[in-house]
Amino acid sequence: MVKKNIRADEISSIIRQQIEQYNDEVTVVNVGTVFQVGDGIARIYGLDNVMAGELLEFADGTVGLALNLETKNVGAVLMGDGLTVQEGTAVRGTGKVAQIPVGEAFLGRIVNALAEPIDGKGEIQTTETRLIESNAPGIISRRSVHEPLQTGLVAVDAMIPIGRGQRELIIGDRQTGKTAIATDTILNQKGKDVICVYVAIGQKASSIAQVVNTLTERGALDYTIIVAATADSPATLQYLAPYTGAALAEYFMYTGRHTLVIYDDLSKQAQAYRQMSLLLRRPPGREAYPGDVFYLHSRLLERAAKLSDQLGSGSMTALPIVETQEGDVSAYIPTNVISITDGQIFLSADIFNSGLRPAVNVGISVSRVGSAAQLPIMKQVAGTLKLELAQFAELEGFSQFSSDLDQASQNQLARGQRLREILKQSQASPLSVPDQVASIYAGTNGFLQKLAVNQVRDFLVGLREFLDKRKPEYLEAVNSEKKLTPKVKDILNSAISEFLDEFLAS
């Protein structure tokens, strides 16, 4: 072995070089130990410097969320099945709260509650991230709701109008068509530059697949993001899914775009949160829900807004869905969400079973801010429709107990029956504004009185085709003027009369 001689001047330069390369950074890792685990909950000892809502990393790779910060331990909920987490497992605090990637690349994709793709189409390439939980826009950041968001449903657009930036609750028993209204609204946004986010919470995978198929067939998936937390997902993911959907929509809202978010449904989220809270031994309140279940939904729905011009005029419209039991809207979660939202569309099982679909109960459905956003032409043509239908429903109930009605009442009943036919619509067939206006105008101006009740729907379908093919000036007039001008009235009067003669003659 050759011994190398180092000169004295080299020694000093080597020492200087080593000193320059010395890194004095000390990495402090916050580590604890699991002492109890089960039912998706882990209790951890030794995690002293942890934030509420901080992400925790377990030794086996499982991720958890710190929710209970107690004097001697931390209660965390697991985001996986947690089967490999056991007593003594090391846990590391990440120092970060839950955040997800966001961006244009999410359009047309199906993701889970952590925004990870689950549609088998590969990774989603994006550079930006957003916190899952972020503050709602303040008062100064907002503008009042003034632009319409058309659902394509006559019953909603005419009588319970929705504006961009509004929160409108869809409430009703199971199997009354709540999801159908939401998906029809997504279909109707085609070509209107509205980004849609559909959040499925605690639903069967087959139900979500059905929605995906409907949107794909109609070409609506291109402008839609689906966030799915299925019924077999851990309660933590069902709890987080709506906030993930809101964060994805917020990205577009703050870039000046218009978005629509559907939460289907918040009853399941509340149940998942109740499960987590009870397992964390938080004190139960009414219906065993924790005391902050109102805040659970209010902080989510307050994120929907119409932004001011200074912030780019973007908007986020929320359509939360809540399921009732036997039509009981006075239960805890329904009353909470009704008080947070700007109105509700109430779907009735009785109306649904009677054959009127969408099964909207016009009498107790309301839109508190939507009238300011309703198109002038719709306001003019449908102004008295809600009142007329409410009076008709009352008279119809009364007529069941009385056989001899005067002529005026019989006329009102006949008119009401025909007006009700206007509201009937097949699923996944939203109507444009000109088509809706023509249908309502024909009904409110007495043109349908010459028809039998069972002929009304066929007549209206034919009328829409007639206007489309033979009266192109009608479409131009409605789209350009947006008001029921004498010109639009003249076109409608002549077209409806002309088609009515043809229809009756055939």
UniProtKB/Swiss-Prot annotation:
Q: Enzyme group, top EC level? A: translocase
Give the record's keywords alphabetically: ATP synthesis, ATP-binding, CF(1), Chloroplast, Hydrogen ion transport, Ion transport, Membrane, Nucleotide-binding, Plastid, Thylakoid, Translocase, Transport
Question: Which InterPro entries does the entry mention?
Answer: ATP_synth_asu-like_sf, ATP_synth_asu_C, ATP_synth_asu_C_sf, ATP_synth_F1_a_nt-bd_dom, ATP_synth_F1_asu, ATPase_a/bsu_AS, ATPase_F1/V1/A1_a/bsu_N, ATPase_F1/V1/A1_a/bsu_N_sf
Please state where this protein is localized: Plastid, Chloroplast thylakoid membrane
- CDD domains (alphabetical): ATP-synt_F1_alpha_C, ATP-synt_F1_alpha_N, F1-ATPase_alpha_CD
Q: Which GO terms describe its cellular component?
A: chloroplast thylakoid membrane; proton-transporting ATP synthase complex
Q: Where is this site: Required for activity?
A: S365
Query: In what way does this protein cross or attach to the membrane?
Result: Peripheral membrane protein
Task: Kindly list the GO molecular function terms attached to this UniProt entry.
Answer: ADP binding; ATP binding; proton-transporting ATP synthase activity, rotational mechanism
Question: Where along this sequence does the record place binding of ATP?
Answer: G172, D173, R174, Q175, T176, G177, K178, T179
Signal peptide start and end residues: none
EC number from the UniProt entry: 7.1.2.2
Bilayer-crossing regions = none
Report if keyword Chloroplast is assigned. yes
* Subunit (UniProt): F-type ATPases have 2 components, CF(1) - the catalytic core - and CF(0) - the membrane proton channel. CF(1) has five subunits: alpha(3), beta(3), gamma(1), delta(1), epsilon(1). CF(0) has four main subunits: a, b, b' and c.
Q: What does this protein do?
A: Produces ATP from ADP in the presence of a proton gradient across the membrane. The alpha chain is a regulatory subunit.
What protein name does the entry list?
A: ATP synthase subunit alpha, chloroplastic
Organism annotation: Pleurastrum terricola
- Identify the coding gene: atpA
